[in-house]
């Protein structure tokens, strides 16, 4: 709710695949009104409205929607390469903004967006959804308690994502470097870097990386291997997008134990969190959160951010730090040497 008990009116920019998860979750929060929809193809926006019983105006030009509708906020669900321009126009319109990850396809654009939001005095948050996976929520809850603190200092993180990425059900824009900004590194590297930064509590300062470029898809990578450092904590991350079972797992090594995390059932791993404390086996930790509500948890946090309440939603600064890491990964892979990660200038 906004001041005076007013419900936040949201204009949705883009009604593609991810918009379904996002709008379904926003409606489930009971905290917003979807006030308008925009898609370049009118029929797709109209079909989207019908699916969710939304009796709202439909536009094919988001700028017209911003000018004609009395909105409080915008939700940007478009291909990565379109985020920056749309975000800047929403800032100019004075709207709060929720934008899909990655924030942009370059740190230069991320910094433009950050400065524009500051200058316009608007609030914004980024959909780095994996912070709100049920096992991640359980992991965070455990680490904030007495047992979690007893593990001592975090020393190392290992993070693996594998999946069959290059299939014909994936929207075509993912295979256009101008729209997607890259391959696995942009789509899943953004997830990995954000969740590791979030758990470690500070951004990457130095890294060494290798990108696997795809001959069949010019300008796209099919995976990467990465070693990084966040202050005194180190990490290893790897991702492959070949014909593989899906895997998404983390292991956090502390001074007095470790924690394993997985959010995919694949015949080897299963969804959950496990504690290893020096014994011969891992013990499963309770997970009172629901995987089906991942996006609801995310949007509750993001709406708190837009309403000026205490929250843990991904910020523009954090999302820009992710972009700086992705660029350093490319630099390291190209040079064959370690790379320092850029920082956000202090204005």
Report each predicted region and the residues it spans.
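C-terminal helix-rich "cap/oligomerization" subdomain common to oxidoreductases
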Residues: 1-4, 73-76, 301-347
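N-terminal Rossmann-like dinucleotide-binding module
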Residues: 2-52, 303
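Active-site loop of classical SDR/Rossmann-like NAD(P)-dependent oxidoreductases
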Residues: 40, 286-300
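Beta-loop-alpha module in the N-terminal Rossmann-like domain of NAD(P)-dependent dehydrogenases
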Residues: 56-116
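Hydrophobic residues in well-ordered beta-strands that form the structural core
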Residues: 60, 99, 124-126, 261
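Rossmann-fold dehydrogenase core element
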Residues: 112-130, 153-157
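Predominantly a Rossmann-like dinucleotide-binding segment in NAD(P)-dependent oxidoreductases
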Residues: 130-210, 214-216, 336
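Contiguous beta-strand/loop segments that form the cofactor/metal-binding neighborhood of enzyme cores
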Residues: 187, 193-267, 296-310, 344-347
């Amino acid at each position: 709710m906004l001041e005076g008990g007013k419900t936040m009116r949201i204009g949705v920019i883009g009604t593609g695949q991810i918009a379904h998860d996002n709008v379904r979750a926003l409606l489930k929060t009971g905290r917003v009104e979807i006030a308008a929809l925009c898609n370049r193809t009118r029929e797709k926006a109209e079909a989207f409205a019908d699916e969710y019983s939304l009796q709202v105006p439909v536009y094919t030009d988001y700028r017209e929607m911003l000018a004609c509708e009395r909105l409080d906020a915008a939700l940007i669900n478009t291909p990565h390469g379109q985020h920056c321009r749309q975000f800047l126009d929403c800032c100019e319109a004075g709207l709060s903004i929720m934008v899909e990850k990655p924030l942009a396809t370059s740190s230069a654009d991320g910094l433009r967006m950050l400065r524009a939001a500051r200058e316009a005095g608007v609030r914004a948050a980024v959909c780095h959804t994996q912070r709100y996976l049920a096992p991640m929520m359980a992991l965070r809850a455990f680490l904030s308690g007495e047992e979690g603190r007893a593990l001592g200092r975090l020393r190392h993180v290992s993070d693996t994502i594998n999946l069959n990425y290059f299939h014909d059900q994936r929207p075509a824009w993912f295979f256009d470097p101008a729209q997607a900004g890259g391959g696995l590194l942009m789509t899943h590297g953004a997830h990995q870097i954000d969740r590791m930064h979030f758990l470690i509590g500070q951004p990457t300062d130095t890294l060494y990386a290798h990108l696997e470029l795809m001959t069949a898809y010019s300008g796209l990578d099919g995976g990467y291997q990465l070693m990084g450092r966040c202050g005194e904590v180190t990490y290893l991350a790897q991702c492959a997008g070949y014909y593989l079972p899906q895997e998404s797992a983390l292991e956090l090594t502390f001074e007095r134990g470790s924690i394993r995390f997985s959010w995919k059932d694949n015949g080897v791993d299963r969804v959950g969190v496990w504690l290893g404390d020096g014994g011969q086996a891992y013990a499963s930790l309770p997970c009172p959160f629901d995987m089906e509500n991942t996006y609801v948890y995310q949007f509750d946090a993001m709406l708190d951010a837009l309403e000026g309440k205490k929250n843990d939603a991904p910020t523009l600064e954090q999302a820009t730090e992710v972009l700086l890491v992705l660029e350093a990964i490319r630099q390291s892979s190209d040079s064959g040497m370690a790379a320092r990660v850029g920082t956000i200038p202090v204005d």
